[in-house]
Amino acid sequence: MGCGASRKVVPGPPALAWAKHEGQNQAGVGGAGPGPEAAAQAAQRIQVARFRAKFDPRVLARYDIKALIGTGSFSRVVRVEQKTTKKPFAIKVMETREREGREACVSELSVLRRVSHRYIVQLMEIFETEDQVYMVMELATGGELFDRLIAQGSFTERDAVRILQMVADGIRYLHALQITHRNLKPENLLYYHPGEESKILITDFGLAYSGKKSGDWTMKTLCGTPEYIAPEVLLRKPYTSAVDMWALGVITYALLSGFLPFDDESQTRLYRKILKGKYNYTGEPWPSISHLAKDFIDKLLILEAGHRMSAGQALDHPWVITMAAGSSMKNLQRAISRNLMQRASPHSQSPGSAQSSKSHYSHKSRHMWSKRNLRIVESPLSALL
């Protein structure tokens, strides 16, 4: 989950992302002393002990604090273990002393208290104090979307469809409740467990909007992650849940290629590209991608919000209905991984010079997929047109 301008803990995983397995003692051989991993673990234990001391006694009575796994402008996320069941959970601690923190907390809780869906992270219980709110939630331990893709040896269009079915099903549920996520991106799509058949969980509702009882479902707040933001948001127009469908189109493009359809180091140039809505299917692995897959993307990345597919229509698209039956079963994993590495590398601008280590992706690419996270910096509209 996220709030305000959330950021990741380095080198640990993001809020509500997978918690690294507790490693064995990494002490060096022959009395060489502890290695860097052991030192990092020791430092984390000290950090957790200090953090635990500030926890509400009611929380400590029910949960053992295991690790700090994420932080945001108004929050910290820790991995915990329920004392009686030994089941792992995540606790998000929201600081509510300041107005911004209170508003973020109220916004997030207004959504989480309403949702219950197999593809959406579940709020389990809440503890409140004068200055803090503790949200106990499901813990996704299976890793981020692209971490899993790189780690596995094979990835086909059918694998992509299976993922997108779960995401679209979750979005359809949210939209039926008049809830708009407003920050859909790969980092917020987590595997529930490490198993091969794990489901996907939609997480991070820090920017989500819950429709008013009056029936007014339009929004005006300029927020989101720039690479995934819909053009109507940039134009300062009142917008609807169709912004989530634009983001799903961006995610689909990235999932099939390892690249983003709209990308630029300059935020102003990035916004111009989004407003033009022009992208292409050049380079690997696009020649191997089916026409139906591209049609699915094309029906989402439409400038006119009212013409985009809804989540229900996305689930009924022929590419999804047939589970990509007419598509090539070619393994796309190598090309996608290479493109992910290329984008992660600050020195590489071509597939041929892309780095290939998984660790390089883990440390670099996560920051590249959403270089300017959450609430975006406003630019004069005239500069974008």
Curated annotation (Swiss-Prot):
Q: What is the effect of changing residue 212 to I?
A: In a lung adenocarcinoma sample; somatic mutation
Alphabetized PANTHER family for the sequence: SERINE/THREONINE-PROTEIN KINASE (PTHR24347)
Catalytic class of the enzyme: transferase
Keyword rRNA-binding present in the record's keywords: the answer is no
Protein name (database record): Serine/threonine-protein kinase H2
User: Which Gene3D superfamilies does the entry mention?
Assistant: Transferase(Phosphotransferase) domain 1
Residues the record lists as binding ATP: 69-77, 92
What's the superkingdom here? Answer: Eukaryota
Q: Which UniProt keywords apply?
A: ATP-binding, Kinase, Nucleotide-binding, Serine/threonine-protein kinase, Transferase
Q: Where is the composition biased (Low complexity)?
A: 344-359
Q: Where is this region: Disordered?
A: 342-367
Q: Which reaction does it catalyse?
A: L-seryl-[protein] + ATP = O-phospho-L-seryl-[protein] + ADP + H(+); L-threonyl-[protein] + ATP = O-phospho-L-threonyl-[protein] + ADP + H(+)
What family is it from? Belongs to the protein kinase superfamily. CAMK Ser/Thr protein kinase family.
- EC numbers: 2.7.11.1
Q: Give every Protein kinase domain span.
A: 63-320
Annotated Gene Ontology cellular components are: cytoplasm
List the InterPro entries.
Kinase-like_dom_sf, Prot_kinase_dom, Protein_kinase_ATP_BS
Q: Which GO terms describe its molecular function?
A: ATP binding; protein serine kinase activity; protein serine/threonine kinase activity
